[in-house]
Amino acid sequence: MIQQKSPSLLGGAMIIAGTAIGAGMLANPTSTAGVWFIGSILALIYTWFCMTTSGLMILEANLHYPTGSSFDTIVKDLLGKSWNTINGLSVAFVLYILTYAYITSGGGITQNLLNQAFSSAESAVDIGRTSGSLIFCLILAAFVWLSTKAVDRFTTVLIVGMVVAFFLSTTGLLSSVKTAVLFNTVAESEQTYLPYLLTALPVCLVSFGFHGNVPSLVKYYDRDGRRVMKSIFIGTGLALVIYILWQLAVQGNLPRTEFAPVIEKGGDVSALLEALHKYIEVEYLSVALNFFAYMAISTSFLGVTLGLFDYIADLFKFDDSLLGRTKTTLVTFLPPLLLSLQFPYGFVIAIGYAGLAATIWAAIVPALLAKASRQKFPQASYKVYGGNFMIGFVILFGILNIVAQIGANLGWFASFTG
């Protein structure tokens, strides 16, 4: 009998990194503008460690169940129906709010690109934000409506383009980083940047979301917990490095005070690119940066809405016929599209709310799963490092994120406006 070769660590790591890295990273420089570069690195490393650990806690619980068992199955068995309902609602909320966030920013960039493409020295074309959002949403929603295969093929093309555009834009930006901008002195009106650290956490959290992929990796590696663990560390580590490079590229070129118009527009990505454009001397870098942002938002939009589409189809029992897929498409896309037309500047705010809901299923629930699984299966072959202390540490991280998001909305904490 020919022994089947075990999948490489790189394959699993790419699944994790590919899931985590997306349009969420575009919000990080704006959400961390208050705490600035050093503080943003601390926030990202802290978030990376806690989110990686919580992912490993899902792995620990998952290994006690048959291959292919879903996240929902494990939560229902270990924590009961109530927690499973809360978990399911938080997942749906995150998917809807991210869809809204991507339509708002994707619409803004579509608007800018079309205006540039169809304007000339003699006449200027002014396509509105509403039209940009409608065009962006309708074209990409058509791929989701068609089939998963259509999404798969189009996403592959977008990812290749995104990687090329990312390296073209960031290498150029990194070469022009100014240390005076990156390590700027504290403004006279502020004694320290630390008060802004807490409110940056919920947006950073969204940048490390991969937890729904853990059951798939358990199946992929044939229940080899150590290999799954290593692939998670490599994948999230790669995401962390890319995020730090992105912070360096943006916050090393765009002065802290210049984030004011970006923050005023809710962290809108097109506003960030417009502000950054003033400090880019080479024209091709602006073009590459625009394409990178557009493709990052498009790939994230397709990935998130495909998951939401399947969730809606299962929830309402819509079949896979033409009529069934049309119903699912309307329920999936219409609410966030209408919201984006009503509130067109809410990208970072929406990402923050997504972080608030994601805290439940990506931090608190995994920690509770680890605790419950150790009580139910005391002889486990794989346990996450840190014992009960680490369970408490991850739950505290989740609570801090919830307090940060709610506190920021209620004005409890300092808010940076540029």
Swiss-Prot record:
GO terms for molecular function: aromatic amino acid transmembrane transporter activity; symporter activity; transmembrane transporter activity. It comes from Haemophilus influenzae (strain ATCC 51907 / DSM 11121 / KW20 / Rd). It is found in: Cell inner membrane. PANTHER family: LOW AFFINITY TRYPTOPHAN PERMEASE-RELATED. Belongs to the amino acid/polyamine transporter 2 family. Mtr/TnaB/TyrP permease subfamily. It holds the Pfam family Trp_Tyr_perm. The gene is mtr. This is Tryptophan-specific transport protein. Involved in the transport of tryptophan into the cell. It is a multi-pass membrane protein. The chain crosses the membrane at residues 7-27, 32-52, 89-109, 131-151, 154-174, 194-214, 232-252, 289-309, 321-343, 345-365, 384-404. Keywords: Amino-acid transport, Cell inner membrane, Cell membrane, Membrane, Symport, Transmembrane, Transmembrane helix, Transport. PROSITE patterns: AROMATIC_AA_PERMEASE_1.
